[in-house]
Swiss-Prot record:
Scaffold subunit of some HBO1 complexes, which have a histone H4 acetyltransferase activity. This is Protein Jade-3. Keywords: Metal-binding, Repeat, Zinc, Zinc-finger. CDD domains: ePHD_JADE3, PHD_JADE3. Residues 1-41, 630-654, 667-687, 714-795 are annotated as: Disordered. Residues 678-687, 720-732 have a biased composition (Polar residues). The lineage of its organism: Eukaryota, Metazoa, Chordata, Craniata, Vertebrata. It comes from the Eukaryota.
Amino acid sequence: MKRLRTPSSSDSSDNESPSTSFSSNKYGSKPGTPASAQKKPAEVFRKDLISAMKLPDSHHISSEDYYLLADTWKQEWEKGVQVLASPDTIPQPSVRIITEKPKEVLFSKPRKYIQCWSQDSTETGYVNIKELAEAMCRYDLDDMDLYWLQQLNAELGMMGDGVVDELTMERVMEALERQCHENMNHAIETEEGLGIEYDEDVICDVCRSPDSEEGNDMVFCDKCNICVHQACYGIVKVPDGNWLCRTCVLGITPQCLLCPKTGGAMKATRAGTKWAHVSCALWIPEVSIACPERMEPITKVSHIPPSRWSLICSLCKLKTGACIQCSVKNCTIPFHVTCAFEHSLEMKTILDEGDEVKFKSYCLKHSKPKAGEPGLSPARHKPPTETDKLSLRAQKLQELEEEFYTYVHPEEVAHDLSLPLHLLDFIFQYWKMKRKSNFNKALLPPKEDEENLLLQPQEDSIHTRMRMFMHLRQDLERVRNLCYMVSRREKLKLSQSKAQEQIFNLHVKLVNQELSAGLPVSSSIENLLFHPPPRITLKLKMPKVQLGNGKSSSKSGNGPLCPDNSCNLYDTSEGGIGQGKPQLHLGRQRIEERINGILPASIYIRRDGGTPPLAVKQSGKPLALHAALHGQSSNGKTKNEAEKSRQIKSNGILDKPILQRDTSCLAASEKDPRSEISGKSQSSGFHKTSLEHFSRSLKEATVSLVRTEDLRTFEKNSRKSSGFSKPLSTERPQGGGRASQESDGYCPDAELSDSEPEAKGKCRQGGRTQNQRGDYVKSASRAKHSYGSRTSVQR
């Protein structure tokens, strides 16, 4: 033995375990222990045997005399060979024979779970299930049978014969039914075979030829009754018994790949998943058959061009499969091969000199038979239809069923059951009469059908379970859709609730700010919770350019941004030159207040020259902005409440006009809304443009704009005031007072009400332009007196 490494001796390589060249303790000895008390080793390995087999690399011998160790991954051979540590103390085995214990039976076979399928029972107490099933009678007597049996026994007693028990009659009825069923099936098969095999017009389903020769006989399928030649269908050897075609062997009825017909002599493709008629494969030029001897499989279907697949048959008018065309030159009428056979078109098979077969097909126009052409009799052009064949077959079957009793031999039944012939004849006549009364139907189902019914529930259960799983999956899909819709609806509801919560928190915050500022609460929390907040439309109009006749160029309207006279929250006259507020459009809530008879808050005049506090209904306007525009505090609230009872009388008419005692501030008198309900036409002309003060923070930003716009606004308002005050006062305003430059806001044009055209029709506007604040204040005072007088006059 030779290794691929440096030469080593046994001393250098045997250093991992004790060697046999010296006697030593494997585990060593404790200090102080005498040498005679040393323990013997438990295991002994000899490495000298391995070392003796090693050869140094310098040893020159032939390669055939040693083995080369090339695997150095796990060197187990370095450990040596284990030998006996104490060969003198080998234990000797001692053996003795003991008596065999009896076996305990731990399992007992229950008889009801054990079935014996053999013919003869092997153990006592066991029975054969098949024998029991065969011994059981399948026919059960009904009430009519029992009554007839009693009458028969009475007659037999009078005749001196023995009585017939119920079991004997049941066995006789079963034997008659079984023999009738077997003989009728054989007769039906024989009749069908005779009707096909001995038919003179029967032809091969492939070549359409009625002739046969020795070695190429015509074979009939025992299930579908097709007739083919041996060579046409590839039958190498005709079987002795029944013969079935390929489709009947598999029990399928596939559709042809090349035509729309089903049934007939068909063969499968190479994959075995698609089928085609052998005749279609022969007549279509692109398709071929791989093995001509067996005429299968059908190949090269993919070589059919798309133009052939797109042809429409001229006979069946279908675009299914591949069509062939007429062989006449310049005639391209397409038709299926099977359709041509059904319509008896001329289909020729020509054998050339080079043993090549050519197929010639002709359309309906070119396949007219010539005079004296053999093989084309009128009967061949009008073959019996499938309906005629089925009706003839049904007629034969009906004749067989009507003569069912002729297929029963009572002598054989009496011999098999060991019964007297005259006794069995009674039962036979009764059986015939009972079956006749049942429209010649069998009294027992065939035994084969019962065996199939035993397997049918299992198949039905599989289909039922598959159908159940399909419906279950559909139901689960519906549940999934419903769950998705419910979750989506709940998410939308959650988002809506969060939005309502945010709106409520904002309203609470604004109410708290209003209460802390000392302002009256404009709306209740309940209205905010149960009613949607009104739509806020903020309309800021700049003064319009006046026309030459002194009228405004803009027209009043009823749009969403144009306030209506019946929907004004409150109406005030000008509080000063260029002072005003934006209009808030809230028609729907104002109409509801008018219908419910709620009085709008009156506008009171403060004597200290400040802006009069306004009691505002729910307008949808942010209260913080409302407070900022007013710039008011809660110190003027008590004075206004004290004067409220004096302004409004029970009949809805002001007691007296409210006069202005301080010329630095003007307040407009507001007409009672109850007077508006009683007379809308009277109140429509007395609405003035509602104006409010802006906060002081807006004064400096708008002072330059107000200087130019106050003059136009003052002229318009002065003409309105002079028009109302003409019937009662002829006093002309005089110059004096402060200039209009002290205005602290701008004034929108006065045309913010739908009632202005009506007011213009009643009152003619006039007067001179007043440029000073004092004159404007006097004019406004006269206007207020005019309102009061006009109201009283019109009432």
